[in-house]
Amino acid sequence: MLSNKNLDTLFTKARSHKAWLNKDITNHQIDQIYNLLKFAPTSGNCCPARFTFIKTNDSKNRLKPALDKGNIEQAMDAPCVVIISYDTEFYESLSILSPHSDAKANFVGKENKVKNTAEFNSTLQGAYFIMASRSVGLDCCPMLGFNKEMLNKEFFPDGKYKSLFICGIGYGDSSKLYERAPRLDFIEACCIV
């Protein structure tokens, strides 16, 4: 089992940060994040998520018009904002990712199945992204408040990728955090049958 310190880093002491320290993250850290999360499970090893790392001011300015007002400051101030999206043609890689069967045939021409599979598994991969980021010492701020159509048009004009959510990553400013909000107790959220 992981140590209590590691569990604190990933879960119990981790927070979603909206304010950031003026400290850059490195491309090596970004590489570490992906090289951890890629090993986490997806159905049929389909791996449909795609990650666009926005670090430069020019790229952030391309993102800004798509952001809801409440997310502008926390996104623009983050050392890096990541677009978690899915590849609408993820099945093209299945001959490599899932070589034990003709998995591609299960998706070709089946738009709803492609969309449902891609959204579900990319959301999982987005959660793995958060845990991987925390494991390399970074803080996160996942956000939904943005215009997906506008963002997709700006960053993915060919329509192949579709955004799910964005996430600021960096070193959070703990002095700006509110007191942690409560969570549901086991009996309120779970049952054993």
Give, region by region, the residue ranges found by the protein language model:
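Acidic, surface-exposed loops and disordered segments
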Residues: 1-193
